[in-house]
Amino acid sequence: MAEAKHAGALGAVYEAKRPEEVAALYDGWAGTYDAEMAVAGYRHPSIALALVSRHVPRGAAPLLDAGAGTGLIGEWLGIMGYPHVEALDISQGMLDQARKKGAYKAYHCLALGGSLPFADGHFAGIVSAGVFTSGHVGVEGLPELIRICRPGGVIVLTVKNTVWEGGFADEIARLERDGVVRRAEETEPYVSMPGEVGTIPSRAVVLVRN
């Protein structure tokens, strides 16, 4: 199923081909991102937060918001009882918006898909919403998130169906067979932006690091 062509900044980031292009587009979008995504009815943050609260013990620390953007998730995690959350995003402009909310203890301007400068097992939990999607990150971003999550830690991801069916589901199945992770929960497919006509459904998945 081909995704409908989206207009404006959303369409541009979905069609981006290189990480530096994605970063520049988000830098330019950062100031109006929250308002525009509210109009689109953006659901990933609320779904991811519900799964974090269900699977990550209150007080667990540190947590990583991978693809934190403007802090739509991070600003709620502190309220929910998670005292130390760090932000990672490819766009400094988006992180600057998140910093204004005081949502995180640290801000890392980095891209998923390559090596990350964190020790093995550093984080008690990781959440990544709206990142494994068109023009952003594919299954290549998963190994490092698993590496930096401690044994027993929880990884909450949202994944667009095209990415899921393009190798992500097979990789998770392989990791389960190899005993690397356990799939604790997988949602039914849902439309992440009901205000955007033609949005391909996504799903959320919760992995526990063995």
Predicted regions and their residues:
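N-terminal auxiliary segments of SAM/dcSAM-dependent transferases
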Residues: 1-20
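A short acidic, Gly/Pro-enriched loop at the edge of an enzyme's catalytic core
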Residues: 116-126
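Conserved Class I S-adenosyl-L-methionine
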Residues: 168-188
